[in-house]
Amino acid sequence: FTFAVENAYLPFNYIDAETGEALGWDYDVFNHMGELMNFTPVYVPTAWDGMIQATADGQFMIAGDGITITSERDEIVDFSNGYINLAQKVLVAADNLMVMSIDDLKSGDYTVAVQKGTTNYEFAVGELGEDKVKAFDTFDFAIAAVISGDADASIIDETAGLGYMGANKDKVKLVGGDLTSEQLGLAF
């Protein structure tokens, strides 16, 4: 059984910086599936931007990675039942006092860092326009841009935002209300 993981989406799948161990909810679930069904999972680190199509093409049996269930994606892959409902939120540097909501991002001269190919990217472009959006290959890079000041904010799933807050203590925070409500599932 091959499982596609990105290893860059806290808390779903990531590499522990101190131990080098692959951790997260996806690993816990896939390992448990292996125990129940008597197989050893084979994890294949995969770039996000090709993961869903590669799963549709049969390169992987299942893809994890906090995949939002959308009608467009459902046309090429099947999904499990949703395993979590979450909201998209605005994430900013902890010392940022200027951006407190999506409205601030809309009205000001701000740059928003997001991962390309995600519903967060689609939302940011739809609400703010492409000129305000910087697309990155992973959310790790997008969050690093916020922390370094190369971007003013990110649009991120709340659960992942909390994961990045835990991993970057006192460096980032979530602000404002819920932007959307989404359901995540496993793709196969």
Region roles according to the model:
Residues F1-G66:
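Extracytoplasmic small-molecule ligand-binding "clamshell" domains
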Residues T2-A4, L91, T111-V114, S154, ...:
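Short, well-ordered beta-strand segments
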Residues N7, A17, G24-D28, L36-N38, ...:
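Extracytoplasmic
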Residues N7, I84-V92, E158-F188:
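Periplasmic-binding protein-like
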Residues A8-P11, W48-M51, I67-E72, D95-M98, ...:
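Solvent-exposed loop/turn segments at secondary-structure junctions
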Residues N13-A17, F30-N38, I102, T119-D137, ...:
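Ligand-binding cleft/hinge of the Venus flytrap
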Residues H32-L36, V44-P45, D49-I62, I76-D78, ...:
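Short helices/loops that flank or line small-molecule/ion binding pockets
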Residues A93-Y110:
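Flexible hinge/capping segments at coil-to-helix
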